[in-house]
Amino acid sequence: MEMKGLKNIRKQKNYSQLKVAMDLSISRESLSYYENGKRSPDINLLVIFSKYYNVSIDYLITGKEFEKK
């Protein structure tokens, strides 16, 4: 599953893949795989990404914030 918001938020914050990977103690290659849908992060890692970027898990997956109806 491609993580549209994961790549978008990293680019919005002008963070390199290397910076994020080092901050979160994961490999840059793994981050690239997550961003491009070659691998899916487990729920624990999604929570870590969500806290790191201060965005919802919905945003990380879809690239859109959850909208209340």
Model-derived features: where do they sit?
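Conserved hydrophobic/aromatic packing and binding residues within compact polymer-binding modules
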Residues: 6, 20-21, 31-34, 60
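Residues within the helices of the helix-turn-helix
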Residues: 7, 18, 29, 43, ...
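Short, charged recognition helix plus adjacent turn
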Residues: 8, 12, 61-69
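DNA major-groove recognition helix of helix-turn-helix/homeodomain DNA-binding modules
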Residues: 25, 44-59
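Recognition helix of helix-turn-helix/homeodomain-like DNA-binding domains
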Residues: 26-40
